[in-house]
Structures are given as structure tokens and as C-alpha cells.
Amino acid sequence: MSSARSFAARRGLYGGGVGLALLLASCATPPPARTLACSDALAPDIVRSADGTKASTTLKVLTFNIEGLGFPARSGRAAELKQIGDRLAAMRAAGTGPDVILFQEMFSGAAKNAVAASTYPAIASGPRRTTKASGPAPEALPGKAKLKRGEVGMHVTGSGLAIASRYPVLSTQMRAYGKRACAGIDCLANKGIMLARIAIPGVPTPVDIYDTHMNSKGASKAPEPRHLAAHDRQALEASEFIDSTHDDAFPVILGGDFNMRHSESRWENFSKYQSLNLVHRVCADQASGCEVRMSWDGDEPWMDTQDLQFFWDGSLTSIRPIRVEALFDGSPDSPQLSDHDGFMVTYRLEWPTSADQTPTC
């Protein structure tokens, strides 16, 4: 082996030229962006209660990590990603698709094209590669940064986040997680959290919808104390971002890939900062009235997945999950096209008919 090749090997899979390859691949295709005028938005079906005092509608939200890593981290994904975009477009055309999709790992050109091919009229993306983190840098993480596991002090791709909606997006905000809030290979992506404020015609308030992708565990190649501390800092930053951007009058939904499967320590840390209602916990209670159309094992099904959704009422418009189901899970009519299943929640939004019906956009 030549000395040059030996040096490249010592740098590890994600060092040197590999990082450059990821950078070039991520820059080749810009993330999709679309806006929908309020005048062009179609209103959902709105139902009034028998006594006429309440009105309600439903909102279907899908969170989906589409495994859109670029070469050389992944290869041969273009066909599956194209199927994802085509199937989402077909579901939307048939009226069976989600109203809002929270995407993660929209890194490669094929992944960005898949999101665009979903045909949703409003699409916004999260932190870009060059989006700066905010706030003072905390102390260093436990252990030492290692070049061979991607802790190179720079990002080679953006966050991979995107939100697609059938309804207008009134505004967006985003936050990249801090430089000392990532561990291992995850540091190559500028992970963070984003907000899309959605206006639903006929609903008296917007809905604040957040999307995030948090630091992985073993896949990060970082030691546990280091990746656990990074995840804890991201949980705190996500909570701070929601607190600073959310309007208490509006219902809130938080979804994404939280990388907390089978990790009591991550759940414990996350719960210190986040008091939103967990959809899995609510729907696991048979008395909740939430229909479960997926396979759940044990008393704590949220421990068996990375893909989660949380929610909270607004002061005027309430929200609760009424159905959960898996998409792209390998069932006969929904082939598995990613290393994650899609997790779709149908929420019921409800408000008093006496509420001010001033258009939200």
C-alpha cells in the first residue's frame, strides 16, 4: 500500500476525500423550495358538533427518515428514493396521503428530487451547510474529537430536514445545533431543528410544526459518554428553540428522528427539557380513543423506535391524536424503501365556533 493510501486509511472512512465527495454531492442539487398562496389553498372538511358549539377537522402528519445519504455513505439508493417521491405523489393525488410530511436525511440529490417529486405545493428546508449555530459554545464534550470519525470542525452537508405541506406555510424558522452539540460522524451534517407555521383554511389559528434529527448512538462511531452528552445538548437546544418561537395560542407538533430507541438515558435527558405529550404514550392507552393501525410490542412502544411525534394544545385550538399507522413498512401496499418506516399520525383539531374566524393568512 502506498504512503498516500496508508494516510487515507488512517483518516478513516469519513475523513479526507470522502468528506469532499459528500460535500460535492450535497452541493450539486439545491433543496426544494415551494410556496403556496392562501388564495390557492383548498380547505379541509370541517365538522360541527351536534350542539353547534364546536368545530373540528383532521390533520395527518407523517415523519419519515428517507435514508437519503449520499455517496460514499450510501450508494444505489436512487431507485428507492424515486419510488418514495412517486408513491407520495400518488397518495396525494388519490386523497389518501398525509397533509404534512416531516422529512429527515434529505442529503443526496436523489433525496432532494424525491421530496420535490412528492408534488406538495409548499416545501421548506431546514438548516443549510453554512447555517451558523446560535448562542455561546458550551464546554467541550467528554473525550477528544477524532478526525477519523468525522469530527473535523466543519460540516459537509446541511441538516437534511424538510417540511412539505398541502397547506400554506406562513413562516419558517430554523436553528442549527451547536458545534459542541454533535458527536462522531453526525458532525458532518449540520443537524438542527426547524419550524413551519402552517395555516389551514377554516381553522382559527395556525399550527406550529417542528422537525428535527438528533445525534445517533453507535452509528456515530463516538464513545457513549460523548454521543450521550451531544444528544443531551441537542435536546436542550431544541427545547429552547421551541420556547422562543412557538406562539402559545397555536397547537404544536414536534416530530422527527430522535435517535432514542432502547436508550433509557437519552429518554431521561430528553424528558428533562421537553414536556410535550408523546403520541405513542397517549395512543398506547386503550381508553384514549386513538386507533392503532400498526404493530406495537410491550407497554412502552416508544422505546422501540427512533421516529416519534409529540403534541400540545393551543390556547384556542386543541389537538389530540386519533389514529397512528406505519407507511413504507413492508406491508403489501406500502413497500419498505428506507431503513426507517414512516410514522403517520392523524390529529383532530377542535375549536369553539364562537372563535374569531379572521383568516390566518
Task: Give the location of each predicted region.
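Surface-exposed intrinsically disordered loops and tails
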Residues: 130-150, 179, 183, 227-229, ...
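Bacterial N-terminal signal peptides that target proteins for export
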Residues: 3-17
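Active-site-proximal segments of metal-dependent phosphoesterases and phosphodiesterases across multiple
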Residues: 214-238, 262-272
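Active-site beta-strand/loop signature of hydrolases that rely on acidic residues for catalysis
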Residues: 60-66, 84-112, 164, 196, ...
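N-terminal, active-site-proximal structural segment of metallo-dependent hydrolase catalytic domains
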Residues: 15, 19-20, 24-118, 127-148, ...
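Beta-strand-turn-beta hairpins that frame and shape the catalytic cleft
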Residues: 48-61, 161-171, 188-215, 347-349
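Surface-exposed cleft-lining segments at the edges of enzyme active sites
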Residues: 69-73, 176-185, 214-229
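Metal-dependent phosphoester-hydrolase catalytic domains
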Residues: 29-49, 240-253, 258-361
